[in-house]
Amino acid sequence: MDALLIQGGNPLAGEVRISGAKNAALPILTASLLTAEPLRLGNVPHLKDISTMLALLGHMGVRVTLDDKNHVTLSGDSIPHKEAPYEMVKTMRAAILVLGPTLARFGEARVSLPGGCAIGSRPVDLHIKGLQAMGADISIEHGYIHARCKRLQGARIVMDMVTVTGTENLMMAAALAEGTTVLENAAREPEVVDLARCLIAMGAKIEGAGTDVITVHGVEALHGAEYSVMADRIETGTFLVAAAMTGGRVRATHTSPDTLEAVISKLREAGAKVSVGDDWIEVESTGKLDSVDVRTAPHPAFPTDMQAQFMAMNTIAVGAASVTETIFENRFMHVQELRRLGANIEVSGHTALVRGVARLDGATVMATDLRASACLVLAGLVAAGETTIERIYHLDRGYERIEEKLTQLGGRIKRVH
């Protein structure tokens, strides 16, 4: 099993090109199920979750052509298997996203209940309730969601809680429904907006994406399109925190500053110098940072997927700060690993109190989920001596060639098999 070896102490410097966003690419890939015509996508990152999704779509009958490095063409003119089997769903919760488009276009779908990171329960009942409100007949048997309908009907759907994948699933389903669907308490995340833009390019009629009320006027059919996936705001944020922690100067390019306002604000509060252009963000730091309180909440507030990275930053900052997680349960699994490096962290319920220490010491640690593994990489970059991170397959689910990109910036990091 692969591991990362990191020699800490080098400031990072230079430019890093940000990859396409995994959490935007996954729903956009499933949008290929909504049309018989080819969908050509650019800026698709090379990640485990992406290849898993492409394998699932291929299993269902979508013809997948990898045109070049980051382009993929999906042709869904024939979908003989309207099913997402457990073997393909268990490693990736985003597979639930095939439910809405498959049901809307074909009137039937069978999807295994999802797996993925072990953080929180992430209930799929909001997806199911929404589709039922649109007229679907849904049952759960033997671990599978069975859904049937004639043609989905537009409906007013009020989400009990903000759900990104739920909003995306229902938005795709509503695109082919008869009549108008209104999604209230919809997720406002940039990835939801990116999916809406792709669907609009395919002929969908959608208003309000990026607000908490999305209106979808159903159409008879969608057509093919060319679309480029948005930049990964979480990868961007991770490199910016790495620059701040190591006392370096890093410019992240091919990214979208307007999707990261909460993160940029917190970096400035910590004492880092942040400059912003149209498609780049630069962080310059002495490495001497102030602790910052962080509270996760749905967009546009501070993103849960940056919580672990800011906890790592707080471990070596001056003072004490609280990190509060309001989105997912079980999202402090990195705390015990950071403690192995010498961090001073106490957890009480959904809040961790982090007291900065003078230095971290390298040790062997274990990645427990995607963002936890990123925070351990950041800690390893500043820890004295060598840090070994095991189980980095989690990292490969969400970061494209992270060790190569960090090496180009001056980090001493290598993958061992």
Curated annotation (Swiss-Prot):
Pathway, per record: Cell wall biogenesis; peptidoglycan biosynthesis
Swiss-Prot/TrEMBL keywords: Cell cycle, Cell division, Cell shape, Cell wall biogenesis/degradation, Cytoplasm, Peptidoglycan synthesis, Pyruvate, Transferase
Residue positions binding phosphoenolpyruvate: 22-23
A Gene Ontology cellular-component term: cytoplasm
InterPro entries named among the record's database cross-references: Enolpyruvate_Tfrase_dom, Enolpyruvate_Tfrase_sf, MurA_subfamily, RNA3'P_cycl/enolpyr_Trfase_a/b, UDP_GlcNAc_COvinyl_MurA
Reactions the enzyme catalyzes: phosphoenolpyruvate + UDP-N-acetyl-alpha-D-glucosamine = UDP-N-acetyl-3-O-(1-carboxyvinyl)-alpha-D-glucosamine + phosphate
Binding site for UDP-N-acetyl-alpha-D-glucosamine: 93, 122-126, 305, 327
Domain of life, source organism: Bacteria
Subcellular location(s) of the protein: Cytoplasm
Keyword Transit peptide listed: no
Function: Cell wall formation. Adds enolpyruvyl to UDP-N-acetylglucosamine.
Similarity remark: Belongs to the EPSP synthase family. MurA subfamily.
Protein name: UDP-N-acetylglucosamine 1-carboxyvinyltransferase
Source species of the chain: Thiobacillus denitrificans (strain ATCC 25259 / T1)
Organism taxonomic ancestry: Bacteria, Pseudomonadati, Pseudomonadota, Betaproteobacteria, Nitrosomonadales
